[in-house]
Design a protein with these regions (language model features):
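N-proximal low-complexity "stem/linker" segments adjacent to membrane-targeting elements
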Residues: 1-27
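Glycine-rich, basic loop-to-helix element that forms the pyrophosphate-binding segment
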Residues: 63-79
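Catalytic beta-strand/loop signature of glycosyltransferases that borders the donor
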Residues: 120, 189-196
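Short beta-strand-to-loop acidic/aromatic patch adjacent to the donor-nucleotide binding site
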Residues: 84-95
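Acidic donor-binding/catalytic loop of UDP-sugar-dependent glycosyltransferases
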Residues: 94-107
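Short, acidic, metal-binding catalytic loop of nucleotide-sugar glycosyltransferases
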Residues: 24-36
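Short beta-strand-to-loop element that shapes/binds the nucleotide-sugar donor at the catalytic cleft/hinge
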Residues: 117-129
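Acidic donor-binding loop at a coil-to-helix junction in glycosyltransferase catalytic cores
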Residues: 169-178
Length: 256
């Protein structure tokens, strides 16, 4: 969609999320105070009802077991080719505040050297209630940006292909690896001053920290050691290839 001559889009890869969850995600994009187009990418399990909605729908013929990275990257590459003025990501289980895109653009306007924005999250329970005492470990407090919090300007587009080329064995850490790539490659992001991303919290430890029973399906926080063991197992030639595919210079390090 056009906003003052600019066109923005949101990319959402999806897998087997139910209709209610996808609808919540899609409705939040449709409500943005700055008009945006929404591109959904089915990772092997397309839902036909989406074709009746005012969104774009890309279908991958099989699932890729990479936490949505390929779908995210393919959607982004299409948006780059179609010359959108800004690209954001939103996973199917999360949703935006109505002013999310507006706040990202405002942060970038205030920080003209930045070529991408970092939004902030609020953690929410499966019933939609917020977890206000939890401060996600991300900018401006910690060195991390969640996938749902990226907003890219065209000068950063040349890095987006790494979502497609990142090895599947590293995909669970994709958002942090991409953050490290951006950190070492481009100026620091414009940080949005308030949370505008509603993040469905399925992290076991956070519920226990609050004295609550974790919901069904909750998982422990990510442990890098499994990925480091995989890196350590690679011959140097393959480790060099991983560097090309990720843009990061991994080393063999103790996994323990």
């Amino acid at each position: 969609m056009n906003a003052g001559g600019k066109r923005y889009c949101v990319i959402t890869p999806y897998f087997k999320e139910d209709k209610a969850m996808l609808t919540r995600c899609m409705d939040s994009v449709a409500r943005q105070t700055v008009p945006v187009e929404h591109i959904l990418v089915a990772d092997g399990f397309p839902q036909d009802w989406i074709a009746t909605k005012p969104v774009r729908h890309i279908v991958l013929d099989r699932a890729h077991s990479d936490f949505g990275n390929l779908g995210r990257g393919i959607g982004a590459m299409m948006a780059v080719a179609e010359q959108y003025s800004g690209i954001a990501f939103l996973d199917a289980d999360n949703w935006y505040d109505d002013d999310h895109i507006e706040c990202c653009l405002a942060a970038l306007q205030q920080n003209p050297r930045s070529i991408f924005a970092a939004a902030q999250r609020r953690f929410v329970r499966p019933n939609g209630t917020p977890m206000p005492t939890i401060k996600p470990a991300e900018l401006p407090h910690h060195e991390h940006i969640d996938t749902n919090c990226y907003f890219f300007l065209p000068r950063s587009y040349y890095l987006l292909h790494h979502w497609c080329t990142m090895p599947r064995e590293l995909s669970e850490s994709g958002d942090h690896l991409f953050y490290l790539l951006m950190y070492h490659t481009v100026p620091q992001p414009a940080v949005v001053g308030k949370p505008t991303v509603n993040y469905l919290c399925m992290i076991d430890e956070i519920y226990r920290q609050l004295g609550e029973e974790p919901p069904p399906g909750a998982k422990s926080t990510l442990d890098w050691r499994d990925r480091q063991r995989w890196l350590n197992s690679l011959p140097q030639e393959d480790l060099n290839l991983v560097k090309l595919l990720t843009g990061l210079d991994f080393q063999r390090l103790p996994a323990a």
